[in-house]
Amino acid sequence: MLISFSALVLASQLVIPVADTVPNFNEERECKIDSASAFDPNAGLNATIKRCMDDEQKAKGQLQTQWSQYAPSDKAMCTGLTTDDAATPPSYVELLTCLEGQQLVRKLPKD
């Protein structure tokens, strides 16, 4: 019985719940961390953060519009990939890029 329970516990950790709505990320935190490494000295830090925030909000809006068009398995995989690194905050741009890539892969001819 102990082995069955252990297998059940392990298997339950492999399931990534996928909501019917776009996940909620902290864009400001992501942009402050990202902008520090992608700093544009010609624009300044505030402009770099603003540009990042604009990109994140645009990607979030696109995700909100198109969320239902993505396959549940793609949403689960891409959400997991986007949120798996505790040191790097999740990004709507990365999530959107992953989902768009998955859609393109599905359109490739099958040999």
Residue ranges of model-derived segments:
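Mitochondrial intermembrane space
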Residues: 11-111
